[in-house]
A protein has these predicted regions:
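Structured extracytoplasmic
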Residues: 4-151, 159-165, 227-334, 425, ...
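Residues that define the transmembrane beta-barrel architecture of outer-membrane proteins
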Residues: 339-343, 372-376, 430-434, 473-479, ...
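C-terminal outer-membrane beta-barrel translocator/porin domains of Gram-negative envelope proteins
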Residues: 391-408, 418-426, 490, 496-600
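Outer-membrane beta-barrel translocator domains and adjoining extracellular loop/strand segments
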Residues: 224, 375-378, 405-411, 460-467, ...
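Residues on the lipid-exposed face of transmembrane beta-strands in outer-membrane beta-barrel proteins
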Residues: 343-349, 378-382, 436-440, 452, ...
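Gly/Pro-enriched, hydrophobic low-complexity segments
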Residues: 141-144, 149-248
Length: 669
């Protein structure tokens, strides 16, 4: 264990041996033949608003406690837990009660801290680097101290201050390296947390928490919210099968299953809440109260929709759900030097009839303030058989700007008269498209997709075309086919071959062409913390009929509704002028992105502690007149924003530099 050079103990060899046992304990637990296990869990919590102001209304999941006169709320839940394997726990809520207005969930992001995976690389929901995994020993310093017969104390602290690292201690079983109890502190996503947990007694249960306590504190621009959570796992079944839960807020049933009695202060808060609720219901006949009630309803249904993400399940078995992004939220905006400020709005929904069949839809729209253009993308998918990835999908898109100089060149050859061409805009068009495909995977290695796609391209400046007596819109309709090959199955690289054939006269098409594209993508996880993402591809036109002016590709196009850090930053061109996407009969591209924490800026003394992830980008492209075009970039993500800095070369000469900024504040809330 040469990586443990900084372990401080009286007997260095003994300390190294203890840490070797800790790092290897999870692998020593026999999980072969493990079947899904059912148990139950109980959670109780207390949330207090010590200080608050109007800004709390705009923070996701904080609307309920910001818009009430009560400063302290309590609650409890009783859940069914299905564990298929260590770390894979599915919780289904059976009973709950709380004093939060409207029954809304508050600070659900901190619930992840109640199920730490202490032996995994990532301790909490992919956020915190675990000190108990062998690959992470380079991030921590350890000290082993004797405690009592058969047990030792291991203290750990980070080598540098960073939001993804924690400090604390663990009580370790000396002979096996099993963690009996641990406590750690940290700060992530504006939440300071202190976690104390004990593990199970035997077998696979020793890898999971038996009881976990969390103290959390949220500080943001004058708001101070503290919360205490206690969770007890692996509870036996206490409700008979004949018990049918009609009301999830049934206090009598909660009294049966509750392993921790409520204290006098919690009882007081519940009694106060029920008394206020009953008094409000008794006064609903008063006119003055009706006006006040309608005001509350307006704030509840309109105000929270504007400021909070809306999620809702529906159906007899909650087989349907939808999610609507908040209308007014920092996450709705992004900025890049080329695109300017962009506003985004997203609606998603799904409904599943059974395990194989279902419906999914998404409406994604955006507005570019620089281009003064609305974009939207509306895919709708009907899954026929999810196990075979068999589906029918339609997609309607509009607003994308494309550049085409071939038409202007053709018009200039036809018109020999003296015209001030610089005053005419004959190169910029707006693309409206509709696509319908059927997809089927005969195996995990192969996939086949066939369908049809249509485009209507209209001139942004129709007056210029009217002045020259030319039409200002052009249509194309093309059958399409795509063959997918996955050499290693669904978790490996993906190779695709796309074929598109535009037919003049088909459904009003006035364009004929033939195009082929080949694309390969692979995201290789070097560890749970780091990955290398690669993409390479080419596309070319094998035929272009007379009057077929437009060049457009499926795998090489500008994304007009950019997402955040985890959406589309890797393997995309950030500084490339939009005109180059449609300016060549061929393209060859290659993209690479490497992401890891604690790479460069994370080591800075003060600002480095805020950096969560870092990336290095290299993007290369060859098209007509660009041989080559290369972008070099570096990016990082923090709790508040993600930022990418890029430098471009065109034909080996400097071609500019730029920034891309996305708001990340409260993205995980």
């Amino acid at each position: 264990m040469a990586g443990c050079n900084d372990i401080h103990a009286a007997d260095r060899r003994y300390a190294l041996q203890i840490m070797k046992r800790v790092f290897g304990y999870a692998a020593s637990v026999d999980t072969t033949g493990l079947k899904a296990q059912e148990s139950y869990a109980y959670l109780k919590y207390d949330i207090r608003a010590n200080k608050r102001n109007c800004l709390l209304l705009a923070i996701p999941t904080m609307y309920a406690i910001a818009n009430t006169g009560v400063r302290e709320h309590v609650g409890e839940t009783y859940d069914r837990v299905i564990m298929k394997r260590p770390g894979d726990m599915r919780l289904t809520q059976m009973l709950e009660r709380n004093t939060i207005p409207y029954g809304m969930r508050t600070m659900p992001t901190v619930l992840k801290y109640l199920t730490p995976l202490i032996y995994d690389e990532l301790l909490i929901d992919g956020r915190i680097i675990s000190p108990f995994h062998v690959r992470n020993r380079r991030f921590y310093r350890y000290k082993v101290s004797p405690f009592m017969r058969g047990a030792v104390i291991v203290s750990f602290r980070p080598r540098l201050k960073n939001t993804k690292l924690v400090r604390g201690w663990a009580r370790i079983e000396e002979s096996t390296g099993r963690i009996l109890e641990t406590s750690f502190d940290g700060e992530y996503d504006l939440v300071r947390f202190h976690v104390t947990m004990t593990t199970g007694d035997e077998g696979v249960k020793t890898l999971m928490p038996a009881q976990c306590n969390l103290n959390a504190r949220f500080l943001f621009l004058g708001n101070d919210i503290t919360a205490e959570y206690t969770t007890v796992f692996d509870l036996p079944k206490r409700l008979p099968d004949s018990t049918r839960i009609v009301n999830r807020r049934d206090t009598a049933l909660l009294n049966i299953v509750r392993p921790i009695p409520t204290n006098s202060h919690e009882q007081y808060l519940y009694s106060r809440y029920y008394a206020a609720r009953d008094a409000a219901q008794a006064d609903t006949t008063k006119h003055s109260h009706k006006r006040k009630t309608w005001t509350k309803i307006l704030w509840k249904n309109v105000g929270r929709r504007l400021l909070m993400r809306t999620r809702q399940k529906f159906g007899t078995h909650e087989q349907g759900n939808f999610r609507i992004s908040p209308v007014l939220n920092p996450l709705s905006f992004s900025y890049s030097g080329r695109r300017g400020l962009t506003y985004k709005f997203d609606v998603r929904g799904s409904y599943f009839f059974n395990e194989r069949q279902g419906l999914q839809l998404r409406f994604k729209t955006g507005y570019s303030f620089k281009q003064k253009q609305i974009y939207f993308d509306f895919p709708f998918t009907f899954y026929i058989n999810q196990r075979r990835n068999a589906y029918i999908r339609t997609e309607w898109s509009s607003g994308r700007h494309i550049y085409n100089s071939e038409m202007m060149d053709a018009i200039r050859l036809e018109r020999k008269d003296s015209i001030d061409w610089s005053r005419l805009n004959l190169t910029n068009f707006r693309d409206h498209s509709f696509k319908a495909v059927a997809h089927y995977d005969p195996s995990s290695h192969w996939g086949l997709e066939v369908g049809i796609v249509s485009h209507k391209r209209t001139a942004i400046d129709d007056h210029s075309f009217n002045f020259l007596g030319r039409k200002d819109s052009y249509n194309s309709v093309a059958p399409i086919a795509e063959l997918t090959y996955r050499p290693l199955g669904y978790n490996g690289p993906i190779l695709t071959i796309d074929y598109e054939r535009g037919i003049r006269g088909m459904l009003g098409s006035d364009t004929d062409y033939e195009r082929l594209e080949i694309d390969g993508q692979y995201k290789h996880h070097l560890s749970a913390l780091s990955y290398l993402q690669l993409r390479a591809g080419t596309g070319f036109y094998t035929h272009k009929g007379f009057g077929s002016y437009f060049l457009d590709y499926s795998n090489f196009r500008e994304n007009n509704i950019p997402g955040g850090w985890n959406d589309d930053w890797a393997c995309s061109f950030e500084l490339l002028n939009s005109g180059w996407y449609n300016a060549s009969k061929y393209y060859v591209r290659a993209n690479a992105a490497y992401e890891t924490p604690l790479l460069l800026l994370s080591w800075l003394p003060i600002a480095g502690r805020l950096i969560e992830k870092e990336r290095i980008y290299v993007n290369a492209l060859t098209v007509k007149q660009l041989n080559p075009y290369i972008e070099y970039g570096y990016g990082f993500s923090t709790r508040a924003l993600s930022l990418g800095m890029f430098v471009a070369q065109r034909n080996w000469h400097f071609d500019g530099m730029g920034l891309r900024v996305n708001v990340e504040l409260f993205r995980h809330w």
